Each structure stands twice: as structure tokens, then as C-alpha cells.
Amino acid sequence: FIAAKSLLPEVDFILDIGGQDIKCLKIHNGCIDNIFLNEACSSGCGSFLQTFAGILGYSAEDFAKIGLFADKPVDLGSRCTVFMNSNVKQAQKDGASVANISAGLSISIVKNALFKVMRPSRPDDLGKHIVVQGGSFLNNCVLRAFEQELNLEVVRPDIAGLMGAYGAALYAQERRKLHPQDSALLKAEQLRTFSHTVKSVTCGLCSNHCHLTVNIFADGKPYISGNRCERP
């Protein structure tokens, strides 16, 4: 939300389709008013497209480019990956081109988001200033399918797949202005001289006899892993 608002201050709806989930944010008066999420199934997300691209022998990028030249996108519905796989196989048997299958899958992602997550009565219900983000929207075929389905234009940032990280950075920057303090991150010189030693020990403080990995840093502070209790 912070990233989208920085790029489009009047944003009133955000759709984020990532690799495994769909997030929809309704904005009112500059604040998040409502949030919609997809169910446990990851169908209709980026991994869904990537899976079928691999099955058909294409990279995700090439599969997306091919879909832009579809003349008759296949109607594949918006079912889960298992059922969609059979639909794609049937489309291949019927002679559908890879371009039309790619476009059909992109449309199914959009329909899944619209009719199973957002469920608007009409396009105007979403808002007038819509930002779409998440790695899935780097696929121009998905972007175009969304715009055609709603018959409107939306804003897709060039860093669509990094909007979460960008928003976190903006938030950290703002917090630093309010509460100035030195960063806990190591500086470049500290990284160049960074060193630590590792040793393995067996703890004898209880009957678990945990095999521990002990990292000891230059300042003498240890970091212990491998324990099965809270003793270390």
C-alpha cells in the first residue's frame, strides 16, 4: 500500500497477484478500508502460469510473450491447477495453439481474482484509480487480460514484483526520520573485516544430548543452533 500510494497518491484499489496468493486492498481516504485474500489454493497465481509454461516447454517470459499474439484465447475457466491441466490437454487435442492457451490461462487468472476473490457487482465498485502489482503482473498478457475484462486502464509499476520491498524501504525511511538512530546493519568496512569461527559440540546439560553448532563472532558473541530445548 505504501509503495502504491507513493506512485499514485489517489489510489483507491490495489490488486497484488504474487506467486502463491492474491491480495486485494480497498483504499478509502488514504487508508486501507478492506482486504480480500484468496483461499488456500494457489491456482490463479504466478506459480500457476509458471507450471503450465514448463509443461508446454517454455520459460515463463517466453510463454507470456507468445500469449500476446493470441487470436482466439481458449476458455479454460478458473478452476484449480489439477482440473486446469486436463482442460489444457483437451485444448491441445482440439488443436489450440500455444498462444491461445497462454492467453486463456492469463484470462483464467484474471477471472479467478475477479469472481472468486474480489467479486465486484460492477467494475466501478473496484475504484477509479487502480494499481496492479506483484510478479504476475510483469506478464503483459495478464495485464492486458485484466484491462480488457474490466474495460479500463490500470497502473502497473515497472517494479511490480518488488512493490512489497519498496514499500518496506519507504516505511523504514519514514520511521528513521521520526526516530533517528544508527542502523544495525553492518557497514561496508565491517563486512570486509567480518569473521567468525564454527565448532560442533555435544550438550550434556540434559538427556537430549543435542549436537550443537556454535558460531563465535569477532566480538565474542556466540550464535548456537541445533538445540532441541531452550537451554542454550
Q: Where is each model-derived feature located?
A:
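Adenine-nucleotide phosphate-binding core of ATP-dependent small-molecule kinases
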Residues: 86-115
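Glycine-rich phosphate-binding loop plus the immediately following alpha-helix
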Residues: 5-7, 29-72, 170, 174, ...
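Acidic, glycine/GT-rich loop-and beta-edge segments that sit at the periphery of enzyme/chaperone cores
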Residues: 23, 174-232
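Active-site nucleophile and cofactor-binding loops and adjacent substrate-binding regions
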Residues: 1, 15-19, 36-44, 104-107, ...
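Phosphate/pyrophosphate-binding loops at sites that engage ATP/ADP/AMP, CoA/4′-phosphopantetheine
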Residues: 8, 113-126
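Glycine-rich phosphate-binding loops at beta-strand->alpha-helix junctions
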Residues: 108, 121-149, 160-161
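Glycine-rich phosphate-binding/hydrolytic loop that grips phosphoryl groups
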Residues: 2, 46-51, 158-186
